[in-house]
Amino acid sequence: MRTTPIRVLVVDDSALMRKMITQMLQKDPAIEVIGTAMDGAFGLKKIEELRPDVVTLDLEMPNMDGMEMLRHITKRGQTPVIVVSAHTTQGARETFKALQLGAFDFVAKPQEGSSLTLENVADEIIAKIKVAGAARKPRPQIATVDEALLRSARKPARPPVASRTTPSKIIAIGISTGGPNALLFMLSQLPADFAGTILIVQHMPEGFTQMFSNRLAESCAIEVKEAASGDLLLAGRALICPGNRHMRVRRMPMGDVVVLSDEPPVNGHRPSADVLFRSVAQEFGPKVVALIMTGMGEDGADAIGAVKAAGGLAVAQDEGSSVVFGMPKVAIERGNVNRVVALDALPNLLMVQSAAQRVSSFD
């Protein structure tokens, strides 16, 4: 248990934003803002001088921008960085680049003209700083994925949608902090003729999931898209739940589909892995493989037990390969999983589990 405050450096080119973030963080006695910086170059000097536990970082700054500063930070050591990102398409694009470079996590600033203010995301920023400050360990080492190489590689042609069959397995994934890189690694290993369908709840703001889906699609042989109500569960397809929606499945005579809803958050989350896991357990039972992966909190830790109880396979990512061992740890402690597996082994597990008799929409 930490007994001293988490020492935070705030880096942002806006004097107003630096002041607002500082005032917001200092309301929590577990956090101490030890300094601020207006650009990346000054921020690096402050890191050397003050040795913060966590850095909050704006990406769009003059002189040295946040991306360049992040490159230097990841080369120099293990100081966790929380990106405070613009809630725009360009902001989402840059945020995912930052996560690949080694940022610990991100928070989306409300858009100008929005009714939301920075105070609306205060709890999220504070929670992520606390998790990052507690982690303070080397990020798990996983095999890196060269996106450019993946895009240029000759992949097997993806079967057209009309010719694809019902899937052999329904794979449901709940994931949070550390998820973008883990999903890129895992999904990019799957072949175009992968026999399962994949449903993903990644804790991410509305608007960011579309950009995230597009980035994954560029690097994967399987189809990856942001889910829409009525999307069919097809072999070789991964559907990512949109931010601020819940995702369930429904069995239909003409093909099984996903259904999105605007129901209230569950355990503080929308989308919620608990909602997805309960739905797939009810509809598909033993034909489900559920993964609870890296992330803070306990979303999905209870409902993955419903998959296990229904005869499906419930899998938790192990501590060594998790950026934050929160969600999987709680699921393990509650006895709700069958296996604990490292990230490097998950692609093979999915391929082996999916190499089975295909699901019929009528059984």
Curated annotation (Swiss-Prot):
Catalyzed chemical reaction(s): [protein]-L-glutamate 5-O-methyl ester + H2O = L-glutamyl-[protein] + methanol + H(+); L-glutaminyl-[protein] + H2O = L-glutamyl-[protein] + NH4(+)
BP GO annotations: chemotaxis
Pfam families named in the record: CheB_methylest, Response_reg
Highest taxon of source: Bacteria
EC number per UniProt: 3.1.1.61, 3.5.1.44
Keyword Protease carried by entry: no
GO MF term set: phosphorelay response regulator activity; protein-glutamate methylesterase activity; protein-glutamine glutaminase activity
Subcellular location per the Swiss-Prot or TrEMBL entry: Cytoplasm
Occurrences of domain CheB-type methylesterase (ranges): 160-357
Biological role: Involved in chemotaxis. Part of a chemotaxis signal transduction system that modulates chemotaxis in response to various stimuli. Catalyzes the demethylation of specific methylglutamate residues introduced into the chemoreceptors (methyl-accepting chemotaxis proteins or MCP) by CheR. Also mediates the irreversible deamidation of specific glutamine residues to glutamic acid.
Protein name: Protein-glutamate methylesterase/protein-glutamine glutaminase 2
Native organism: Koribacter versatilis (strain Ellin345)
Origin organism lineage: Bacteria, Pseudomonadati, Acidobacteriota, Terriglobia, Terriglobales
Gene name as annotated: cheB2
